[in-house]
Swiss-Prot record:
This is Protein raptor homolog. GO terms for molecular function: protein-macromolecule adaptor activity. SUPFAM superfamilies: ARM repeat, WD40 repeat-like. GO terms for cellular component: autophagosome; cytoplasm; TORC1 complex.
Amino acid sequence: MDKSYNFSSSNLANSSGLHNSINSNNVNGVNNINNNNNNNNNNNNNNNNNNNNENVNNHNNVSNISNTHQQAKKKEKYNNNNNKNKPFFGEERHKDNATPDVQKTKIAKWRMRERMKTVSVALVLCLNIGVDPPDVIKTFPCARMECWFDPSTQPPQKALDLIGKTLQAQYEKWQSKARYKQSLDPTVEEVKKLCLSLRRNAKDERVLFHYNGHGVPKPTTNGEIWVFNRNFTQYIPLSIYELQTWMGTPSIYVFDCSAAGLIINWFNQFAEQRDKELERFSGNNQNNNQNNNQNSNQNNQNNTTNSTNGNTNGNNQQNNNNSNNNSSNNSNTNSPNMGSSNSVNNNQSGSSSSSSHQRDCILLAACSANEILPMNPDFPADMFTACLTTPIRIALRWFCSHSILTGITADMLDKIPGNLSSRRTPLGELNWIFTAVTDTIAWNVLPRHLFQKLFRQDLLVASLFRNYLLAERIMRSANCTPISCPRLPPTYQHAMWQAWDLAVDLVISQLPTLLADPNAEFKSSPFFTEQLTAFEVWLEFGSEHKDPPAQLPIVLQVLLSQAHRLRALVLLGKFLDLGPWAVNLALCVGIFPYVLKLLQSPAGDLRHILVFIWAKILALDKSCQLDLVKENGHAYFISVLSSPQIPADQRTMSAFVLSTICNNCRPGQNACLIGNLLPICLSQLNDPDPMVRRWMILCMAKMWENFEEAKWAAIKENAHEKLCLLLTDVSPEVRASAVVALGELIGGAEGSEQRTNIELNLALTLAVITADCSPMVRKELVISLSRIVSSYESNFVQVAQEIAQEERLRAVLEAKRLEESRKSKKRASVPKISDADHLNNNSDLYGNGSQSSVYGCLWKIILNLCTDPFDQVANRAQSIVKRISSKFSMEELMSHNLINRTNFNFNNLNGSMNGLNSSGSGFLNSSNGNLGASMNGSNLNSSNNNLGGSSGGGFGLNNSNSSIRNTFVNISRITNRDPRSPTKTKLGNQRSPILTSSTNNVGTNLNGNQLNLNNNNINNGNINNNNNNNSSINNNGNNINNNGNGNNNNINNNNGLGNQLANTFQSLSLSSGLGGNKTNKMSQSISSMNSSSQSLQNDFLMVSDSMPFEEDELYSDYYEWSCNYFSKPMMQSTGEDFESFESIEKKWKRQRNEMIIQESKEAVQNIIQQPPKSFSQMTIFAEPNGQPISHLQFHPFDNILVVSDGLENISVWNYDDGQRINTFNNCNMSGTRITSMKLVNDYDPSMIITAADDGVVRIWRGYESNDTLKMVSSWRAFPEFATTGNDPIGRLVLDWKGDSGLVLVSGETPDSPKIRIWDVERELGVQDIFIGTESVVTCMANEKRGPLFSAGFSDGLVKLFDQRIPGKYSCVSTLTEHKSYIVNVSMPASLGGKTVVSGSSTGEIKFWQHSYECSSTTIHNNDVISSFSVHEYAPLIACGSQNQRIKIMNFTGEDVCTIRYHDGFLGQRIGPVSCVAFHPYNILMGAGATDSIISIYNGDSKSKSNVDW
């Protein structure tokens, strides 16, 4: 499947380019991007035809990419829906737990932080025309031209002036704005004056010194060049050291003279000498400063002593002496042997830069130290200067001298039509190609940092070094080797020169025709088209591990051309899509200024690819945000975002770009706010594409992050209300984004009652997320709640104090009750009513009621999250608790005189809870499957509570099974547990009573405020249907009186989400021991936890000391993780690399799996025709911990058996050889056990899903090894009944529906038993099915390809449900024939999936078709069975018994065999059978016993040693 972005264009031939110029000083010598659309006259007809052909090719190439990303996603979804083996829990959030990779790609230093200009140029010409230097013997004829002018044709002085002007004009073509100064046949003083003047004016910018020494001797071996002194001698040396001093830094030198390499050598030597002097000078200064400090300290002491003794005069004399000594030390500096003694001072006066950077100066020399300049009369004498300043002219002349072309003269070469700046002319095209070729050579040869310095830092320097590459090629042919500093690798034989020669050849071959007929058509070179094709070929086969594409700089140059621009952008986008390494390369080559200026283009055909390119750039380097704001680039993306007709993928990428612009960038936030980004994002929150919704939310979150003005604008737009609607979105990423955005709205409400009310309402609204199936969403919830805690810290500290005090009092009461029970030996668990009454009536702990205020409710939610089954969630919540707990002193609490109180009274131990009644805050609405919100004011009422009601919405919390005290205790028990180290904890035999609160009415009167929370007729319907009662929380406009501690608030909740919140608050209040009535059995739960008050105090202190604690506020990394999506390939085909190891392994596994399925079909047919006569024992092994075996699961294709024991340990075995592969802990809460276990994904990646008595469903991946083991997800199956280790839900039964990714769970819940369906793709509870009986579900099974599933009950009922039917009507049929506990049910594929096979504990096995009211077949096993299994495809049934026997029979009830003994001569009797299971395909059966023995039996074996007939 090709998952790609659409970069096709329906009108490429008419695509318009940029009409705006690009002034870019940091581009490779190109000042602007011009289209010149109006210049397509008759002279360019051939160009137009070529362009049209190129556009057609572009269209053909681009159309090969998939139509749109949206279509690709639809295709992927279609393929997934039609793939019956689609893996689950394979999303990115499951692979990395929504945590960004800490090993981020290192961003290359592509941005030139020290960008500079060459602002001054000194042209020093020592020609002495008419007089040859004495040390050079010239040939005859020899080269005479200087700057393409023969000086012998003019008088010497006039020729000298003309050469100077011509050289200046040649330089001005490369840098027209520089300040040029000529010094013709100068003296030393003139050179000095010139250099100091230019340096003074240039300040910190670069100065160029061009030296032509053709009329003077060669440089000396002492580091000197020659100038003139007319007063004494003809030639006088000028030290390079002095020249360095006058020029300062930064500077660039061009030396065009014989033996110029000597100058380079001495220049570097002097630079090193200067560095050593500067280091010595700095060291002296340091020593002097230290001496000054010591002397100053000593003087101060002496002053103090002398002032005491009256010896002032002596001290003053000493100070004077010290001052004189310091002055003499500071003035003592060393000067070099060659140069002025004031060189350091001169350098400082001439340059503000440090002389230590002399080695960083750039030098270009015409030849090496032992070479002389070429004297070929066909070329100018200053060939090196010609190469540097007129590269095209000298290149054409050199090419003709080496070409077989005839009829081309030098005069013809000088008359090539066009100009250098017009790319549509022959001369301009040659210059354009030359720039691309030299850039490409430099890019592929030079190190990246050197390329950046020489080709991207300075416009003039870049031009000179491009031309220097040509000089190396031309002058080497004349046995002359140019030298540069920094030294470059050899480039004169690079392959790109051949492409340059071809382009030159094509132009010169047309030259006679073009000169003869000015109207002749010029045939453009196919150079760029061919290079783009080469780049495209590289994209097809290249990768990060291969050499980067050589044509990348050419792609950059092609962006200047309208004809090639679209194709170049598409190819560039494909290259950037390869990964962050490709983006780094593109930025280093200089792509940034080009694509930045392209944002000013109105061309619609460039929009999609420009958005994609910018998304790739910003995914790597966020620092580009300021550049975008500065160039008004954000407006481009806002315009894309504001057009609903633009494809979703482009709007998604635009939202990402805008979010990056706003990320920690106040100018970006302000610009986007002014640009009306907020209403645009809000208008698209209901977009059908979840990626659009997600990034619209994150874009808004980043816009108002720490930006109060944007927060107020969001509140005015009711953004918080609209975001609340998305808390139940079907996409977990959208829900997490909504939580992040709402969390970012929190904070900064100081002094604003309206904002305070809104923030508290938002925090209460977020409570519904605690029931979310996705750990990613719950993690973001904790972080958002931490912002509330930070904003209202004092209120939460007060709540925490009161809860801690209450727990101490409760521990005292418990100790007293235990003491009395030991004395009386009559009551072991019933508390004294009088004590409880006194606790309620006389303790000032309940007088202020702050625990049941808004802050109290939120604090209890946080405490509940401390025991979240997912570590990342629990750890963050625990850090909040630790931070708040550290704010108050435990010793102070323990010193309170609360323990010695008497006259306790339990008559009215009712929880108190203040709600929220806020003006200007808000309320929530749940209607027709959507969670609605209206945050204009709230009076939350609770009545006729319903569970559910939103489309995929989460289930309301009702945490009535755990006290806050138990929460504190369990925090320390669940932290830092290693899931790979199985524990040996034994299952406790006693369970605490399960608390129920669903029918309790909580009445609280606090400070005159009444709270009503009525739980009447909980109606849990089908969440996915519109039959639900519409839910709302009505706003009565009541005002909140927030006095800082949360008192004097009122909550009234209606049904729907309001009911969910009410249930949450009520249950949290109950779970903290603050709610309920005399029937509340909280004391029983407490008594089962501890036997003394001291243990409670120790537990609480242990929590404060053991939890990780960070003073800083929790930080969400969800945004950074979300950004990773754009760093990964987005338009690449998802087709397999058939040569990779992974592809070969996958192909092998696919063939193996098909073979296993085929062999199993044959085996099933054989069994149908001739049932097996025995099941021979294949393997036997034992669990080392000695625990009973509770569950067995065969892997469908690998020789793996997954085993769980009677506690919380899971082991993985190779059943072929009986070797244990791995063992790990399920991370249950203490005292609970694994109650169900299934395998998820028949094909890779296989995972284990477990359910335990603690009410938690866990998903494990990589279970074959501890190195790969990871908890993918975990959630509470019934979050409204959150449990601790002492009050488990009971047997939590789980079934996995692999075709649709549904998890069916049921258990012994406090209220009416139900079956809940969770959708693992959406990670939401989607349906509650009421079973219509008070008995408990013991087992479940589903048809593999349909909506039906069956459930067995503890009272013998078997019911068939249709998940398409909502609520209490889901049960479509009931079998009442069983009279005892249902051990297991099955809906085997061998019976079409429509027949239910059930087995009861008395041994009855019934076959039941749902279209009938009674069973069609009954098999009487005549034995009590403890385990029961049916083969999925073969007509085989296995029954295990506590009587140490396994019976295997067919569907007609005929016994196949009975297993009583293990194999062997002295076969031991098998233990009491606790579980049996068939292999999904093969005729294999596994059996586990209470003696920890596991046996594997093969139905194809002919052995009879273990068979009892």
